[in-house]
């Protein structure tokens, strides 16, 4: 499995290097988009509970060495720099990261251990709200009205391939719950799941 992880990291770096950089060209640019992407991805791979604890862990010498060895990345942006760079990235630009990783796992036989019945897979679904406001909103917000007060939110449905025998899971492309063109009704997690 370590060889597969190494190949996955190479694939991830290639996918992340394709992210559009929305900054104006400058000689003062310190970080590449791929470094910001690897910095964000590393929080999950190293299983740190937050960006802050991840940054604190990397400040220690041995963790920094482990990070460089695993991710082949010398420059690590801070959590704020990662947010500033990646917040402007369109979610569709991240889909190849998931697709390419899943294709590689399948080609390397990594998905076989997750097979359930008749070559199928168990999929865990989790819907979550990651933004909510009674004032600030955009065209992608879901609107909930309660007692005459509108609450605007962003929600996402996350699907993951799981197995009862394996502690790791394989994330699939998240589906954002947002208004769909040509539909009068608001989007919901059930509809997002069908997409």
Model-derived segments and their meaning:
Residues 37-39, 85, 156-157, 176:
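Long, contiguous hydrophobic alpha-helical segments, chiefly transmembrane helices and signal peptides
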Residues 55-61, 96-109, 189-194:
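Short, motif-level signal for alpha-helix interfacial/capping segments enriched in acidic residues
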Residues 83-166:
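Active-site-proximal, Lys/Arg-enriched surface segment
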Residues 2-77, 83:
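Gly/serine-rich nucleotide phosphate-binding loop at the start of the catalytic core
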Residues 146-195:
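Electropositive, glycine- and tryptophan-enriched low-complexity nucleic-acid-binding patches
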Residues 21-22, 126, 189:
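Acidic side chains
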Residues 51-62, 100-102, 171-180:
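Short alpha-helical "patches" and their helix-cap loops
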Residues 28, 43, 47, 71-75, ...:
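Short secondary-structure transition/capping motifs
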